[in-house]
Amino acid sequence: MLNPIVRKFQYGQHTVTLETGMMARQATAAVMVSMDDTAVFVTVVGQKKAKPGQDFFPLTVNYQERTYAAGRIPGSFFRREGRPSEGETLIARLIDRPIRPLFPEGFVNEVQVIATVVSVNPQVNPDIVAMIGASAALSLSGIPFNGPIGAARVGYINDQYVLNPTQDELKESKLDLVVAGTEAAVLMVESEAELLSEDQMLGAVVFGHEQQQVVIQNINELVKEAGKPRWDWQPEPVNEALNARVAALAEARLSDAYRITDKQERYAQVDVIKSETIATLLAEDETLDENELGEILHAIEKNVVRSRVLAGEPRIDGREKDMIRGLDVRTGVLPRTHGSALFTRGETQALVTATLGTARDAQVLDELMGERTDTFLFHYNFPPYSVGETGMVGSPKRREIGHGRLAKRGVLAVMPDMDKFPYTVRVVSEITESNGSSSMASVCGASLALMDAGVPIKAAVAGIAMGLVKEGDNYVVLSDILGDEDHLGDMDFKVAGSREGISALQMDIKIEGITKEIMQVALNQAKGARLHILGVMEQAINAPRGDISEFAPRIHTIKINPDKIKDVIGKGGSVIRALTEETGTTIEIEDDGTVKIAATDGEKAKHAIRRIEEITAEIEVGRVYTGKVTRIVDFGAFVAIGGGKEGLVHISQIADKRVEKVTDYLQMGQEVPVKVLEVDRQGRIRLSIKEATEQSQPAAAPEAPAAEQGE
């Protein structure tokens, strides 16, 4: 009854298997894709009919990781998977971005893609596997989809591009780039790099696109064997007469409105034109569909902006194609934060802060590929007021998570190593105004805030968003795009980096036919823009401050004998807990004996260091210590010396005469001088008050003659 159809092929160093017809046969299509023991099960369900009045394409992509895939039980209270993690959200976006532009315009039937990770090899990341699975399932489904796409990860090791590097290889790589595209064109790039050149980045994109052709070929072969018939879907016929009537009423007026350079004024005027046009048309014929009229107006609006750009006219806000909007850069804008900056580019503004914490503040991520600790956190917030709207405020949405991750990638390459700067760093970008490329404003603001906080970043970084308008062979690359240019253009191309090279590159291409030459022009134009922004930023702050904020914790590092770690921690953490309370510091101990003491007050840190040195000091036989009586027993007393170490003063060692009752001589908490008589092989300490007293008396005696000699 079950008749699986399987296709195997070699993809770089991995073997990929595509299998369909075995599971989820009630879904529109389902594929199990495996790559060296990492397996992702991808299903697609498409509704045959669109909902009445549906005016957008409702595509949903869900990516979910099951802990059983790694042979683990979830660590949560309920012991089952909950809402998507940040990593799952990012991979869902990674799948969504290259497939969305391949559905035909006018197709508004609901489509859901669900990718479930069911087995994982710690060396093979499931994201590429899931992207291949989504492409295969959509291609098999018969849903109108102009795919398939291929997906590849590209690394750069020893000056060589590496296809789909393993997790271990990625640690050595200067590049982590994911590229997806059809047979003819690149559609999406997502990457982080250690300041590589424009040519190296472009080479990686081209390499990945060439290598992924084997995926596309094998999906096409699988479709020939197991694909469902293509849906008989046709776009709604275009009402040419209505289009012409709307254009006659609105086109010239919209063209004039798009000469208004202020965003709010322009939006207000465009809204008036649209409202008046729709009202006029409905008065002429009340059977017209208002949504349809809105779509026609949007198409005219798009055409107006695009044709002006292609004709070489000034852009919406009056700029030339490669001009950057006016910049305003300020640092130290918030008095009690560790570092802060306000970065404004035209009508886009980001208030960015940097906060320093200890290793205890690092985020522990329990991921499918294994547990890891993140000491650099980047959070991006996009409140509704930034675009003059009202809306829900709460947990971050997919877009905020994606933009935060991109901005983090832009800064990551210049962050100092933990051994040089042992702080956990959190950057938060509050977008206070937005009109295009707020993620790149966040990169610029983060660089400034980190320098203001005294974080020794390797170089300043800046980011820029590029756009593209293309008709036939005629194209124009735009620098520093506005929100409108992003929506109406054919490409969104974000580049972040330093003067030396690129740290992050993200591309989303909405059309086919973007050539290597066009990408080269865009990258070179972006470099010029990046250097211009860095020049303005350097006028505000050109190097990290020499010292961290007075409000930031200072981390002092000392080394102790690893054998003494247990003494500093104490039974059940009792000693270290008491130490932190007593000194008002945060103390962290590593397995190699490295102790990090964090305090905002230098005196508190010195006190903590002194106490740790006391605790870890070797007890010297014959030395006299001042100790405190901690316990009294019939045969003597226990006295704490040298940082919590406890020794026994036998009843015979309390005084130089016979002692009947210990409490006649000693009380709890009493401070007494004690001499160390012996430390046995088990670490037990024998003490004597009697000998300490005898020793201290003769020691003081010779001072009198010395004083006499001095007289």
From Swiss-Prot:
Chain residue ranges for the region called Disordered: 689-711
**Residues annotated as domain KH:** 553-612
Q: Which Pfam families match?
A: KH_1 (PF00013), PNPase (PF03726), RNase_PH (PF01138), RNase_PH_C (PF03725), S1 (PF00575)
Its UniProt entry gives the catalysed reaction(s) as: RNA(n+1) + phosphate = RNA(n) + a ribonucleoside 5'-diphosphate
Q: Which UniProt keywords apply?
A: Cytoplasm, Magnesium, Metal-binding, Nucleotidyltransferase, RNA-binding, Transferase
Where, subcellularly, is it found? Cytoplasm
InterPro entries found in the cross-reference section: ExoRNase_PH_dom1 (IPR001247), ExoRNase_PH_dom2 (IPR015847), ExoRNase_PH_dom2_sf (IPR036345), KH_dom (IPR004087), KH_dom_type_1 (IPR004088), KH_dom_type_1_sf (IPR036612), NA-bd_OB-fold (IPR012340), PNPase (IPR012162)
Q: Which cofactor does it need?
A: Mg(2+)
The UniProt entry's GO biological process terms, in alphabetical order, are: mRNA catabolic process; RNA processing
GO molecular function terms noted in the UniProt entry: 3'-5'-RNA exonuclease activity; magnesium ion binding; polyribonucleotide nucleotidyltransferase activity; RNA binding
**Where does the S1 motif domain start and stop, copy by copy?**
622-690
Which residues does the annotation say bind Mg(2+)? 486, 492
Q: Which NCBIfam families match?
A: polynuc_phos, PRK11824.1
- UniProt record similarity statement: Belongs to the polyribonucleotide nucleotidyltransferase family.
Report the function annotation for this chain.
Involved in mRNA degradation. Catalyzes the phosphorolysis of single-stranded polyribonucleotides processively in the 3'- to 5'-direction.
Protein name per its UniProtKB record: Polyribonucleotide nucleotidyltransferase
The source organism is Shigella flexneri
Q: Give the gene that encodes this protein.
A: pnp
